[in-house]
UniProtKB/Swiss-Prot annotation:
Pathway: Carbohydrate biosynthesis; gluconeogenesis. Coiled coil: none annotated. It is found in: Cytoplasm. Its EC number is 3.1.3.11. GO terms for molecular function: fructose 1,6-bisphosphate 1-phosphatase activity; magnesium ion binding. The lineage of its organism: Bacteria, Pseudomonadati, Pseudomonadota, Gammaproteobacteria, Enterobacterales. This is Fructose-1,6-bisphosphatase class 1. Keywords: Carbohydrate metabolism, Cytoplasm, Hydrolase, Magnesium, Metal-binding. Belongs to the FBPase class 1 family. SUPFAM superfamilies: Carbohydrate phosphatase. Binds 2 magnesium ions per subunit. GO terms for cellular component: cytosol. Mg(2+) 2 binds at D112, D115, E277. The gene is fbp.
Amino acid sequence: MKTLGEFIVEKQHDFSHATGELTALLSAIKLGAKIIHRDINKAGLVDILGASGISNVQGEVQMKLDLYANEKLKAALKARGEVAGIASEEEDEIVIFEGDKAENAKYVVLMDPLDGSSNIDVNVSVGTIFSIYRRITPLGTSVTEADFLQPGSQQVAAGYIVYGSSTMLVYTTGHGVHAFTYDPSLGVFCLSHEKVCFPEKGNMYSINEGNYIKFPSGVKKYIKYCQEQDEETQRPYTSRYIGSLVADFHRNLLKGGIYLYPSTASYPKGKLRLLYECNPMAFLAEQAGGKASDGKHRILDITPEKLHQRSPFFVGTESMVDDVERFIREFPDA
């Protein structure tokens, strides 16, 4: 049995000039995940369920657990001293860590502390998403927004934690995707899936079909394609949608499938956040042999212009993402 800590140290040689900072940073995220795991499991017994009454910069009401998870992860990252600053879906602006150690830290972290938190009240899986970049401003200075507005192709590491029937941490440093299952009796994450890859063919699609009338024409055509009978391509595909990006992505990663969150009339630029959700999941997808697109472009090639930028998002088995891109090209909206 190999623990996450042992595995990270073992793989440290994958990085040129590695001196342990990234290892310590990932350990901080691991600690934050353990704390969130513990408190999610007793959320119904203490007053951390429901809405907080506070709205974020996008005007969305934040859940109590969103804010709680944000504070716990932020504290864990700050305490290790390997992070110069963070950007979070729950923070209006970047958070700059102070002190000499932070100013000399090489990395910045972007995160969605608790994806799918509206599902907590009904005991449905939720997750944490994180993304790590090497800063571009000089060491010895405070980080700026420019350190966070880098294309996803510049990510050093990315991953997620899914809190479900078991808690799993899945991550990549650009050398494959690896998954670890939490053993609460020992308090450690143990390697359970090494070098995870999408199956070559998928047969599941994940989308909120209740919004069908609002979807672009190409996406509507693709959904109909998924539902058609065709033995050669093993259609119809199965529709599976949880409403938590982490949970839907995780299932599709292991079973084969595509997750779709297109632009709609309500969200013409898409709803998911490029920096906190799309980029890290796209990095994981590509490292697992999959693909991620905004319908026209590779997600990891997009240069972000603002912290809370949104994007349409299609991610999963490569051939399925290719298909939806083809439908979007062939059936453009006027």
